[in-house]
Amino acid sequence: MTSPELPSASTPDAAGVPFAVPGAEWHVEDDFGLSLTLAIGRARQTFRWLRPGSFLMGSPADEPQRGSAELLHEVTLSRGFWIADTACTQALWMAVWPVNPSHFQDDPRNPVENVAWHDAQRFIGELNRRLSGVHARLPTEAEWEYACRAGTTTPFSFGSTVTTDEINYHGDFPYAGGAPGAYRQRPLPVRTLPANAWGLYEMHGNVWEWCEDWYADYPHEPQIDPRGPAFGKMRVLRGGTWSDPARYARAATRSRIEPAYRPRSTGFRLVLGAP
């Protein structure tokens, strides 16, 4: 397959044109859009291109089981970005960092977990050092929700309710009167469950995912490329986990913990941005 001709990372991206990533093995256009794959040792990570766009971040007042910190407000992301189609796996982690911190180590396709925000930043720093010209980072909270929603406005990218065939959550606690489902008591290997409409797997459930931002209340005004406050005490977590009720896997759910804390249900997902 012939790779599309892409501009360099320094090319202005106002029109949402995907930028090239040095060292990418190939670019593929499929039903989900454009993707690229990076090789790090024996590990491979696919990234999906998300175009710039505007969306409503947070949840409407009538959304069942919403949290108090989910003020609905308009957000515009003015630049496109590449986002990993899965959480960082243990295989990818071990290709960069020699010690696997995870509790569930029986499958290298499992998401890495038991990771502090600071651990993720050290991993990313080493990854960027090894892959010259690559600018990996954590997603901002706004980028994360934009990617999770994949153009939807419902509580989940799959619709107004979900089952454990779609999301790995504590199935004894379904969403808004839904039927109980499986409680797997552990994370699943990535790509086990269906992708959202933009080709991203397990954005809901499985493991919490760190975001770049310090946690703060949402503003009432429309925002362009929000990045959170400059200082804070807690970093943002998104997505819910295998051990939580379904409500915590909603696209709008926000959580936060201290960046040095290492819960065994927390991992992260990479974004590639222009330097």
Regions found by a protein language model. Give the residues of each.
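Functional-site microenvironments in short loops/helix caps that host divalent-cation chemistry
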Residues: 50, 56, 60-61, 103-106, ...
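Aromatic-acidic/polar surface patches that form glycan- and anion
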Residues: 82-86, 113-116, 193, 259-263
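A short glycine-rich, aromatic-capped structural motif
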Residues: 37-101, 116-118, 205, 274
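Generic alpha-helical secondary structure signal
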Residues: 88-96, 122, 244, 248, ...
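Disulfide-stabilized, aromatic/cysteine-rich ligand-recognition loop
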Residues: 2-15, 19, 194-196, 229-275
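Short, polar loop/linker segments at the starts of domains and inter-domain junctions
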Residues: 36-38, 59-78, 177-179, 185, ...
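GGW-centered surface loops in extracellular recognition modules
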Residues: 3, 14-49
